[in-house]
Swiss-Prot record:
HAMAP family: Ribosomal_uL18_B. Belongs to the universal ribosomal protein uL18 family. GO terms for cellular component: cytosolic large ribosomal subunit. NCBIfam families: L18_bact. This is Large ribosomal subunit protein uL18. InterPro entries: Ribosomal_uL18_bac-type, Ribosomal_uL18_bac/euk. Part of the 50S ribosomal subunit; part of the 5S rRNA/L5/L18/L25 subcomplex. Contacts the 5S and 23S rRNAs.
């Protein structure tokens, strides 16, 4: 029987394979208890074209003294930042790679904020 983490990693692997077959740039999300990370990765997976996370110094200042990066409000902020950085790099359309995480809570907040900021997926 697979552990919860092994199940998530298996789902993540399958998603990465499907996105690679499509040959499009992907927006990948990773979350921990304290932070959330988003990266835009090239079609072949060799380069990170844009990234944003709650671990960045500028974001931590915006979050305030508490530095809470593990909530939905912080995820929305990261969604907007990653969309702005991707658009600055000339990327309008991506495939959303949620890395096996459920499309709920922080992952959903990040995705919806990125869509509102103009990223298409």
């Amino acid at each position: 029987m697979l552990t919860k983490k092994e199940q998530r990693l298996r789902r993540s692997r399958q998603t990465r394979i499907r996105i690679a077959q499509q040959g499009v740039v992907r927006l990948t999300v990773n979350r921990t208890n304290l932070h959330i990370y988003a990266s835009v990765i090239s079609e072949d997976g060799s380069r990170v074209l844009a990234s944003a996370s709650t671990a960045e110094a500028e974001v931590r200042k915006e979050l305030g003294g508490s530095g809470k990066g593990g909530n939905a409000a912080a995820a929305q902020m990261i969604g907007k930042r990653i969309a702005e950085k991707a658009k600055a790099a000339g990327i309008e359309k991506v495939a959303f790679d949620r890395a096996g995480f459920a499309y709920h809570g922080r992952v959903k907040a990040l995705a919806e904020a990125a869509r509102e900021a103009g990223l298409q997926f």
